[in-house]
């Protein structure tokens, strides 16, 4: 009997109900997905998630999430381990990429796939390093407080300066997701940074951590981890942010994983020096 091939694969848009399958595969890869990421992800682009099926059984996944008219982000590129090497991943990739409709696409690629991404037109921007460690006890900063609904406009504006696209729909959900805790720092009445920590499969995840200065980032980091003293925490930091890496290394965090931020073309200028921790590897 002939084994099913790519010609037998049916790729369709995934729904939020399919998210447990996708996030389960991601967890099996050691990516430590957040426990309540799905609603925030689908809020940004409900049509940006795809599953490949053979005879109705999920075998592959990918997301191509659009932000406005110029930018998209690719993630969740997965094939069931026992079915790799049969062309299902590439077939899923080709079917889903059309969703970007000419936008510049970004991704955070695992080491094993980076050469394939280069062949598909992606160029390296920088490495992103995941650091893991135990949340330390710290002294609260009076300028840091939990984010409130009234802060949404200010945080959306700050976020837009630190990311290559506006993402108000995503941010509104991300700040208030189940188990998510968001903090901001105001100095002289102006937002100088914000961050979010959330529960995940293996370790608490911080992301984003956007801040004007290392001092702002340190104050936010302390607030984010205040209720997690002794728990394992993970944060993904662009290698270009030496101050961010120094901050976590000082706390005893060590590298555990790396990806490469890659783009297919130019992106809107943003304050990359403020990115002390990326939001997610799946949606950028």
Model features per residue range: what roles?
Residues 39-49:
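An N-terminal domain-cap segment
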Residues 91-141:
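Hydrophobic alpha-helical segments and helix pairs
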Residues 2-8, 15-20, 40, 53-54, ...:
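Intrinsically disordered, low-complexity, positively biased terminal segments
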Residues 143-147:
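Disulfide-bonded cysteine-rich modules in secreted/extracellular proteins
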């Amino acid at each position: 009997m002939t084994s099913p091939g790519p010609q037998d694969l049916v790729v369709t848009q995934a729904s939020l109900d399919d998210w447990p399958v996708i996030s389960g595969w991601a967890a099996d890869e050691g990516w430590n997905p957040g426990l309540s990421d799905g609603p925030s992800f689908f809020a940004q682009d409900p049509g940006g998630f795809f599953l490949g099926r053979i005879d109705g059984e999920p075998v592959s996944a990918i997301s191509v999430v659009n932000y406005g008219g110029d930018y998209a982000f690719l993630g969740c590129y997965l094939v069931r381990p026992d079915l790799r090497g049969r062309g299902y991943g590439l077939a899923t990739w080709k079917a889903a990429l059309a969703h970007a409709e000419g936008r510049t696409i970004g991704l955070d690629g695992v080491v094993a796939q980076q050469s394939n991404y280069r062949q598909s037109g992606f160029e390296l921007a920088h490495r992103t390093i995941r650091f893991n460690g135990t949340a330390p006890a710290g002294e609260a900063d009076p300028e840091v407080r939990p984010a409130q609904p009234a802060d949404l406009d200010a945080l959306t504006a700050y976020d837009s300066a630190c990311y290559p696209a506006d993402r108000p729909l995503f941010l509104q959900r991300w700040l208030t997701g189940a188990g998510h805790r968001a903090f901001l720092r105001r100095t002289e009445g102006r937002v100088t940074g914000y961050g979010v920590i959330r529960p995940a499969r293996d370790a608490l995840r911080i992301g984003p951590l956007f801040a004007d200065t290392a001092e702002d980032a340190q104050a936010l980091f302390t607030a984010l981890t205040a209720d997690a003293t002794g728990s394992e925490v993970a944060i993904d930091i662009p290698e270009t942010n030496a101050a961010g890496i120094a901050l976590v290394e000082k706390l005893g965090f060590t590298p555990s994983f790396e990806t490469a931020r890659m783009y297919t073309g130019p992106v809107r200028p943003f304050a990359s020096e403020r990115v002390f921790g990326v939001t997610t590897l799946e949606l950028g």
